[in-house]
Amino acid sequence: MAREKRKRKENVFMKRLLLICLMFCSLMVQAQDLKSLFVAMPDSLSPLWTEVNRADFGDFLASNMKARVRNRFGNFSEMLKLTDDYLLMQSTSVSTMEMKLLPVNDSVNIICMVQTYQAPVADSRISFYDTAWKELPVSQFIQLPEESVFYKTPETTAQTDSLTDVRKYADMYLLKASLSEKGKTLSFVYTTPEYMDKENSDRLTSCLNMKQLEYEWRDGKFQPKK
């Protein structure tokens, strides 16, 4: 009799343990959307917004309201888009933030964040995080384009001299990055010519073979689009 009671208790304990595990797994799955992840974002990575601010953005959009919130510095930030895997924020009057939830494999997602500053020409910073907001090496998920990839290969000595001369005025490598809302692509626009005077900007632009590059998420990393 005592042995049967002990066995029943063990069965009850195992069922409760299984239920707790299932609930925990369910919560983890629910947290794999950008709204939940954004709210859980550490304050150290979110100097403009409190946790309440971050929750308000999503709640306002879900209620079909303008998601405009006064930030810690007394200015307004506005969330423009929010889906399960994409977020677009007008952080300040001169900066934006994008996030994209991307699959590394069937069970692991990471967050790609693109912060773009218009000062006055757009330039972006890309970072990657796991879903616990631990920063990950950028090189693990993308090899950023070299500046030279945007330029034509000179075919004559005169073209080489002209390119060398005009690039003296292009002393900053400025690159605007943008995540796609619906796809899993990352585009780069070469913005260096935009901060130069018109004459040198036109000269530099004539030496470019492209101003935009597209990368696609493939095999757990961003790679140049085929």
Task: Report each predicted region and the residues it spans.
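Bacterial Sec-dependent N-terminal signal peptides
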Residues: M1-L37
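Terminal domain-start segments
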Residues: Q32-L102
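Short consensus segments that form the blades of beta-propeller domains
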Residues: M89, T116-A122, S201-S206
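Short, flexible beta-strand-to-coil junctions
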Residues: T92-V94, V104-D106, V114-V121, V189-Y195
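Short, surface-exposed coil-to-beta transition loops
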Residues: V94-E98, C112, V121-I126, A170-L174, ...
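Mid-length scaffold segments of soluble, non-membrane domains
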Residues: I110-F141
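Short aromatic loop motif centered on NTY/YTY
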Residues: V138-Y215, Q223-K226
